[in-house]
Amino acid sequence: MTKQILYQENARKALEKGIDILAEAVSVTLGPKGRNVVIEKKYGPPQIINDGVTIAKEIELEDHIENTGVALIRQAASKTNDVAGDGTTTSTVLAHAIVKQGMRNVAAGANPIALKRGIDKATQFIINKISEYSRPVEDNKAITQVATISSGNDENIGKMIADAIEKVGREGVISIEEGKSTTTELEIKEGMKFERGYISPYFVTDSDRMEVVQENASVLITDKKITLVQQDLLPVLEQIAKTNKPLLIIAEDIEKEALATLIVNKLRGILNVVAVKAPGFGDRRKSILEDIAILTGGQLITEDAGLSLDKVDLSMLGQANKVIVNKESTTIISNANENNVKARCEQIRKQIEITDSSYEKEKLQERLAKLAGGIAVIKVGAATETEMKDKKLRLEDAINATKAAIEEGIVPGGGATLVHLANDLFNWAKGVLKEDELIGALIVEKSITAPLKRIVQNEGKNGAIVVDEIKNLDFSIGYDASTSKFVNMYESGIIDPAKVTRSALQNASSIAGMILTTECLVVDEMNRNMEVRK
């Protein structure tokens, strides 16, 4: 296919057109009075969306040149979403503002490379200031406020996420499922859960719920296949029978003959036992079994450690406060050795840091979450499929923002933090930078007021007036667009995670700098005649 090549100002202007289109479509959703965007779907009903990155992903323009601009600015939103999970609209608005200001200066003769250096230095200055001003999240109230703001000011969602984090811990898993009613509900699943159920229904102790429930159980954990009870398990089973304690057996597999012996002993009341297959596959299976051993304070019976089943004694077994096994899953609730569990969690965190594989990272995070604090499931309720999708997107944003706040702290929201830091940036840049680098820094100084201006504009008022007013007020004071008043943002609960604000600016300035230093654009040339014939 033939290519179309554009140079210098023509290339930058062509990109700017696409950027303008995407930025306008996304920025209408910003703030408490932001509007929704309706997206036509090829299959199924149209989708009503208030989420910046989802809108950005859906926009494809017919003009290849303009579409390149869309794709570039989309990167800022996507990267912010990957890192912080929220702030995608803010990132798009910031990138658009920096590009617009930068284009004017490049057209007036400024050196794009020097401008980019100034933009990068100014961005780093602001990032350091955000870190300096951020407050740690210390209580449930702050978590509720962050989640409420990020979910589109839905207080019920905010409280639900705060409750979930309180119950499963700050590293616990919060998953979202489609509910079966019109109300959104929170369900907490305590302890460590893995997706393996009982091998036989004959182990069931609660026939109404078809579950095995054991209190104060011993846990035998092995990566071996159990073939014969007499050969493999008899010594330990005799010891367990004397204690009258229930027994959970987790093994690679249990052969029919061994399984039959266990069931007979269970039905005769000699032994309260349940057997499940080990979760996972390959090396991951062994790691998960080691996690379970650490959680319960037991030992993994494996030949690698020189241990065999016929030599097992009671001291090698784990202990669980409660075990619940159904057809599909096993839940172990145990607080046998908290210090060892914490050490294991730290070890998994280090593995997460050094691994490059996103799949491996995801699996390690799952293991960490299961060890660290259990699972919270939010069952989303809605009257229609369209509402369901919108609610799920808002919930995802809220959960991500909350975790980001816990990680790096909080700052005043509603665009106020960046407006307050504009004065600091101006004074610093004037004293440190010169010529085109200074112009680059001042581009950032003007651009970081854009999110607040857009929030006020979406409310139907003049953003420039509000920005000038806020610059002269205390750092904690900002503009509440829902009430049109200047308020203490911390007291009013209008707060943003520092990580979201930082990531939004970092990714916006990175992409904008790349666009400003573009001198040539090569795209596929559209065949106009072919388009007409179609």
UniProtKB/Swiss-Prot annotation:
One of its GO terms (cellular component) is chloroplast. GO terms for biological process: protein refolding. It is found in: Plastid, Chloroplast. It catalyses: ATP + H2O + a folded polypeptide = ADP + phosphate + an unfolded polypeptide. Keywords: ATP-binding, Chaperone, Chloroplast, Isomerase, Nucleotide-binding, Plastid. NCBIfam families: GroEL, PRK00013.1, PRK12849.1, PRK12850.1, PRK12851.1. Together with its co-chaperonin GroES, plays an essential role in assisting protein folding. The GroEL-GroES system forms a nano-cage that allows encapsulation of the non-native substrate proteins and provides a physical environment optimized to promote and accelerate protein folding. This is Chaperonin GroEL, chloroplastic. It comes from Galdieria sulphuraria (Red alga). The gene is groEL.
